[in-house]
A protein has these predicted regions:
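Active-site phosphate-binding and catalytic loops of NTP-dependent enzymes
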Residues: 54-55, 93-97, 112-117, 134-140, ...
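P-loop NTPase nucleotide-binding/switch module
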Residues: 84-86, 100, 113-160, 173-178, ...
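A generic structural signal for well-ordered coil/turn residues at beta-strand boundaries
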Residues: 20, 41, 101, 120-122, ...
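P-loop NTPase catalytic core
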Residues: 152-153, 159-437
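Flexible glycine-/small-residue-rich
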Residues: 26-28, 36, 49-51, 63, ...
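Phosphate-interacting basic helix/loop segments used at nucleotide- and nucleic-acid interfaces
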Residues: 4-9, 89, 145-150, 237, ...
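N-terminal accessory targeting/assembly segments
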Residues: 1-104, 109-113
Length: 437
């Protein structure tokens, strides 16, 4: 009699357990198809390779097709075969974050890669919604980055999101290292997405240095890692930055690069059956990018200032990823290969760069000085060919004469060695001295 009373509950328990299990039926490229278990999009699953040795690969539900789950693994698919059991954990990917992550190098799911141990912390979701627009504080304070050309002419505010646009080999990573060492932000969170393995240690030891690493967290997903890890690394870094923002900190989030995050999303989208749209990018790329970028910015507690490098394909500044990023971000710093060839570093093209919040956070005097410097650059650039071939005669145009007189001092102000550091007030004083006459 008692057994009969509890039979329906026993059956329910068995049904619930077995609904959490499924079986691999197909593997094509990056995608694993399974029949069952019951799951939702972004649920985390275990694909059991050897139950006796407790050997399993973690995977995420990235889509559905004909009543089958489409899974993408966080690791290589070696060892996974048809018939492997799939277990649903029942929750999406979350990461353990806390003050213990500072000074560490982590992979895309917050596992230390430097041999360290992270203690304590709380779990933050990797996939999170941006703050409510009405809860965001208005950007009203300058965030000094310690680079004269940026602080003086493309001034960045706390909570701003700005892109660093450049082709390959023009100095994006070096500039990020200068920002990380010189910034006045409380915490640096650095995401190296799709980088060459050789460059990771170089960036940490040469560009970032011991001084920068003390208050930094570095999240690394090199180019050989699966697309899902590269994609999640960008979101994991953002989740870590969100944790520190919620503690009332001013965080500088630096991501190198947004382009490789988009390429990883392209791999995931195409493998899930999305159609290619513009230059092979599926629609999800254009929805995932704003979701990622909007998570940075101010909140009612602290701020995340986002610096995102964008690798400009073939130096074409109108290609889809570059154009989309530029339309979402609050400004852009353009690095010029032409300036790099002249040994002008950082190779920032001031006339092509803009900070959309500078007018609201800089003083009137600062804005006037920045405008005068840009006028000198613009005037000289227009007349440069005539000057170089000797066709321009001094005295023909007062503005050109003034630009010729000032151009060397202007270029000296715009150049900066990687080991040089300036306080914000020093930078403004140097800008004033340019135009004292």
């Amino acid at each position: 009699m008692m057994t009969h009373q509890f039979e329906k509950y026993l059956q329910l328990g068995e049904k619930t357990y077995f609904n959490r299990l499924g079986k691999v039926v197909k593997i094509v490229g990056l995608t694993i198809e399974s029949v069952g278990p019951d799951a939702k999009l972004n649920d985390l699953c275990r694909i059991v390779i050897d139950r006796e040795k407790d050997h399993a690969v973690m995977a995420e539900v990235v889509g559905f097709r004909d009543k089958r789950l489409l899974l993408m693994p966080f690791e290589n698919v070696e060892g996974i075969g048809v018939g492997c059991i799939v277990e649903n954990t029942g929750h999406p990917l979350g990461v353990l974050v806390g003050d213990g992550v500072l000074g560490h190098t982590l992979d895309g799911i917050v596992r230390p890669t430097d041999g360290g141990v992270i203690e304590g912390g709380c779990e933050y979701p990797v996939e999170a919604d941006p703050p409510d627009p009405m809860s965001r504080k208005i950007i009203s304070e300058v965030l000094p980055l310690g680079v004269k050309a940026v602080d003086g002419l493309i001034t960045v505010g706390k909570g701003q999101r700005i892109g660093i646009f450049a082709g390959s080999g023009v100095g994006k990573s070096t500039l990020l290292g200068m920002f990380a060492r010189n910034t006045k932000a409380d915490i640096n969170v650095i995401a190296l997405i799709g980088e060459r393995g050789r460059e990771v240690r170089e960036f940490i030891e040469r560009d970032l240095g011991e001084e920068g690493m003390k208050r930094s967290v570095v999240v690394v997903a090199t180019s050989d890692k699966p697309a899902l890890i590269r994609n999640k690394a960008a979101k994991t870094a953002t989740a870590i930055a969100e944790y520190f923002r919620d503690q009332g900190k001013d965080v500088l989030l630096m991501m190198d690069s947004l382009t490789r995050f988009s390429m990883a999303q392209r791999e995931i989208g195409l493998a899930s059956g999305e159609p290619p749209v513009t230059r092979g990018y599926p629609p999800s790329v254009y929805s995932e990018m704003p979701k990622l970028l909007e998570r940075a910015g101010t909140s009612d507690k602290g701020s995340i200032t986002g610096l995102y490098t964008v690798l400009v394909d073939g130096d074409d500044f109108n290609e889809p990823i570059t154009d989309t990023a530029r339309s979402i971000l609050d400004g852009h710093i353009v690095l010029s290969r032409k300036l790099g060839h002249k040994n002008h570093y950082p190779a920032i093209d001031i006339l092509q760069s803009i900070s959309r919040v500078m007018s609201a956070i800089a003083t009137s005097e600062h804005k006037e000085l920045a405008g005068r410097l840009k006028n000198v650059l613009a005037t000289y650039n227009e007349a440069e060919d005539l000057i170089n071939i000797g066709a321009y005669k001094s005295g023909s145009n007062r503005e050109i004469d003034y630009a010729v007189q000032k151009i060397n001092a202007v270029n000296q102000f715009l150049c900066q060695r990687t080991d040089e550091k300036f306080l914000f007030d020093e930078e403004i004083d140097l800008l004033k001295k340019l135009f004292e006459d």
